[in-house]
UniProtKB/Swiss-Prot annotation:
This is Disintegrin and metalloproteinase domain-containing protein 7. The chain crosses the membrane at residues 669-689. Residues 26-176 form a propeptide. Interacts with ITM2B in sperm; the interaction increases following capacitation. Interacts with HSPA5 and CANX. Required for normal male fertility via maintenance of epithelial cell morphology in the caput epididymis and subsequently correct epididymis lumen structure required for sperm development. Plays a role in sperm motility, flagella morphology and tyrosine phosphorylation during sperm capacitance. Plays a role in normal expression levels of HSPA5, ITM2B and ADAM2 in sperm both prior to and post-capacitation. This is a non catalytic metalloprotease-like protein. Glycans are attached at N84, N167, N174, N583, N628, N664. Residues 199-393 form the Peptidase M12B domain. Residues 401-487 form the Disintegrin domain. Residues 690-789 are cytoplasmic. CDD domains: ZnMc_adamalysin_II_like. InterPro entries: ADAM_Cys-rich (IPR006586), Disintegrin_CS (IPR018358), Disintegrin_dom (IPR001762), Disintegrin_dom_sf (IPR036436), MetalloPept_cat_dom_sf (IPR024079), Peptidase_M12B (IPR001590), Peptidase_M12B_N (IPR002870), Reprolysin_adamalysin (IPR034027). It is found in: Membrane.
């Protein structure tokens, strides 16, 4: 027993020394105990799943740490990998090999500590428990003990008050306003509400040769290491309602693809050029991080472009990977990603307790983002509108997996504020995902203090004259869908027409491009659009600049005057024109943008170019044609706003947009009306002829009333009439019937049935067989006469 204890102690000491874990003040040997957990949602998933999973969806572990027992509640990180996840490496011949492994199962989890309100965890269960967890401000690292068959683990306690050396700093490239870059993709039209929803960052990770060499054995060691880092980053960014998902990784196993030097700024410039010109052509992502294991003689541990997310050239960063602790490297990745999202360091006056906040300096894993960082991030979203983080890259089955605590209101739930430990909503019962007694709502623009606002309360004021104010319904906590004035509605005193909820004008576009009071230049400038070069054209077809036609001149390149140099990545051009006759000098300033999916230098679509005319893709066309109002009106019902066409604001009556369509529609209508009238006329003629025949029959029949017959009873809707008439045994059965129906009240409008009450018998009491034959006669003619009577 004694030798075994000595051996175990020596193993623990060697593990601590070999790992070189930074910032810990103590460790403790623990034996995590797995608790049974099989709930209804687990049973449902087992029945629905065709492929059994090695790793469970939900786990409970009990850990006795000191005098306290902690219950670790873990949920599998469903948003961990993107649908198009890929792995790239290089063989001995430096040939690139790319795989797309179908990862159906993994061992990475996130969670919290039960009964601890402020807690979090990022754990892998691949071979024992390995990762990070915290309780309030205290943070821990847990790892399995090497060579132990008893399930022994070491829990290291991070020292919150540990000194922070300068070698744990980072650097962000500083840009002046002049060089701040905004890609056109960022400013594409998105509703403001989109930026309040959940965001998604598709992260790509590149590991240099040094990182590969230190983690090449066992074969999947580097993969699990990078996955652990991304899982930690994802846990951190959930506080900002952001999911960080790994879309792929590339391993420079045969040598670095760029020059990595001690100057991190130079390394970042090399890396940004490589990822834009090489990596972007074969892989889509929102941000890429280079993990460098090269011992760089610099105090900086990472570098990033501030506010660079979604920019083709600058959405990248470099992070040093020299320490064995995955959580510390993951924390640095989260820090650099924060710079890319517009966050600055938590320096004075934005302070944060040591080691607590992601954007502060520190050598141990952080806990959360400071209020300053959150404010800076929200301001970045408002100003820059990074569009790439709005699309959801996760597999559909990941998004649809229902359970109480996933922060999504699934079927059968009234609310879902996340795990019990994370829920801060006073309206929702986090244990059952139902509203607390007496409450009617949880959140929304029409929900206040857990109660719905009254009907008619404005929940979304009109942002401008092309917008429409929305009001609460009184029965829904959500504000109705954001609606706007119909495209083409006059605005700004007739200077423009509404388009997609805005009133685009050239003055506003100039102010956006060049700021500083820039406005539209003289109309003579637009003659430059006939040149057909980069600074004067209407269409760009495969880098061939098509000059404008006369009618489209004011829909090509926009020309401005005043303002400053453009803040966008591109080339400015100013023409100085002189008009000798009018003795005026004109400045015509325009620009050509780089790295853009659409050219902001062209006059915006929807801008007025004449009475009833607007610009559309470099052409000046009729407003009705541009907005396709015919389709709009056909989809709308009276004054309703069509849900499928947010651009349509419907008016009373049909909207005919083109004479050709109107004529076609009118022709069809006339043909239908004429055809109906012809059918009605023919029908009336036939009825008149039959009516005259019935009159003649009654005249013939009036001379033969001496014969007595059976009693007929005719049923009508409102009254009964009984009379005795003979039923002839010859070919004239209709005469009597017609005469009988002659006395039908004028209110009678439809034929009814006639029943026979009795039949005549001969003196012997035997019914006349001929009468039975008459009973079976066809009464169609009677019905015809009845209709005419």
């Amino acid at each position: 027993m004694f030798p075994t204890g000595i051996f175990l102690m020596s193993v623990l000491i060697s593990q601590m020394q070999g790992r070189g874990i930074v910032g810990v003040e103590g460790q403790e040997l623990v034996h995590p105990k797995k608790l049974s957990l099989l709930q209804k949602r687990d049973l449902e998933r087992i029945h629905d799943s065709d492929t059994p999973e090695e790793y469970e969806e939900e786990l409970l572990y009990e850990i006795k740490l000191g005098r306290k027992t902690l219950t670790l509640h873990l949920l599998k990180a469903r948003e961990f990998l993107a649908l198009n996840y890929s792995e790239t490496y290089y063989n001995i011949k430096r040939e690139m090999v790319t795989r797309h492994p179908q990862i159906l199962d993994h061992c990475f989890y996130q969670g919290s500590i039960i009964h601890e309100f402020d807690s979090a965890a990022s754990i892998s269960t691949c071979n024992g428990l390995r990762g990070f967890f915290r309780v309030n401000d205290q943070r821990y690292l847990i790892e399995p003990v090497k060579y132990s068959d008893e399930g022994d683990h070491l829990v290291f306690k991070y020292n919150v008050k540990a000194p922070y050396a300068t070698n744990y700093s980072c650097e962000g490239l500083n840009f002046t306003k002049k060089s701040t870059l905004i890609d056109a993709k960022i400013i594409e039209e998105h509703k403001v509400e989109d930026y309040h929803k959940e965001k998604f960052i598709e992260l790509f990770v590149v590991a240099d040769e040094f990182v590969y060499r230190r983690n090449s054995k066992p074969q999947n060691k580097l993969r699990k290491r990078i996955w652990g880092m991304v899982n930690f980053v994802n846990m951190i960014y959930k506080a900002l309602n952001i999911r960080v998902t790994l879309t792929g990784m590339e391993i420079w196993s045969a040598g670095d693809e760029i020059e990595i030097v001690s100057n991190l700024e130079s390394t970042l410039l090399h890396f940004s050029t490589w990822q834009e010109t090489v990596l972007k052509k074969r892989k889509d992502f929102d941000h890429v991080i280079l993990l460098s294991g090269k011992w760089l003689y610099t105090s900086m541990q990472g570098i990033a472009y501030p506010g660079g997310i979604c920019q083709t050239l600058r959405s990248c960063s470099v992070v040093k990977d020299l320490l064995p602790d995955v959580n510390i490297i993951g924390n640095r990745m989260a820090h650099q990603l924060g710079h890319s999202l517009g966050m600055r360091h938590d320096d004075f006056p934005c302070t944060c307790p040591l080691g607590k906040c992601v954007m502060g300096a520190g050598s141990i894993p952080a806990i959360k983002f400071s209020k300053c960082s959150q404010t800076q991030y929200q301001q970045f979203l408002k100003n820059q509108k990074p569009a790439c983080i709005l699309n959801n890259p996760l597999p559909e089955e990941f998004n649809d997996y229902p359970f109480c605590g996933n922060k999504k209101v699934d079927e059968g739930e009234e609310c879902d504020c996340g795990p019990v430990q994370e829920c801060t909503n006073p309206c929702c019962d986090a244990h059952k995902c139902v509203l607390k007694p007496g409450f009617t709502c949880v959140e929304g623009e029409c929900c206040e203090s857990c109660q719905m606002k009254k009907e008619g309360v404005i929940c979304r004021p009109a942002k401008n004259e092309c917008d429409i104010s929305e009001v609460c319904t009184g029965y829904s906590p959500e504000c109705p869908k954001d609606e706007s004035q119909a495209n083409g509605f006059p605005c700004k005193n007739g200077e423009g027409y509404c388009f997609m909820g805005l009133c685009p004008t050239r003055d506003d576009q100039c102010a956006e491009l060049f700021s500083g009071g820039a406005e539209e230049s003289h109309s003579l400038c637009y003659r430059m659009n006939q040149k057909g070069n980069r600074f004067g054209y209407c269409k760009n077809k495969d880098n061939t600049f098509v000059p404008c036609e006369e009618k489209d001149l004011k829909c090509g390149k926009i020309y401005c005057t005043g303002g400053r140099r453009s803040a966008h990545l591109g080339e400015d051009k100013t023409y100085n024109l002189k008009n000798v006759k009018q003795n005026i000098s004109i400045k015509c300033k325009t620009m050509f943008l780089y790295h853009n999916s659409r050219d902001m230098g062209l006059v915006n679509s929807g801008t007025k170019c004449g009475e009833g005319m607007v610009c559309s893709n470099g052409e000046c066309i009729e407003m009705e044609k541009a907005y396709n109002s015919t389709i709009c009106s056909s989809l709308c019902d009276e004054n309703d706003v069509d849900d499928n066409e947010p651009d349509c604001q419907c008016e009373e009556g049909p909207i005919i947009t083109e004479w050709g369509e109107a004529l076609n529609l009118t022709s069809v209508s006339i043909m239908v009306v004429v055809l109906v009238m012809v059918i009605i006329g023919v029908g009336l003629v036939i009825l008149l002829i039959r009516y005259q025949k019935c009159i003649k029959m009654k005249q013939v029949q009036s001379s033969s009333r001496e014969i007595r017959g059976i009693e007929n009873k005719v049923y009508f809707p409102d009254e009964h009439q009984t009379r005795s008439e003979p039923i002839f045994t010859d070919i004239y059965p209709l005469h009597n019937t017609a005469e009988s129906l002659e006395r039908v009240p004028s209110t009678f409008s439809s034929p009814h049935y006639i029943t026979l009450k009795s039949v005549s018998k001969d003196p012997r009491g035997i019914a006349d067989p001929k009468q039975n034959d008459n009973m079976n006669l066809n009464l169609d003619s009677q019905s015809d006469c009845t209709r005419l009577g």
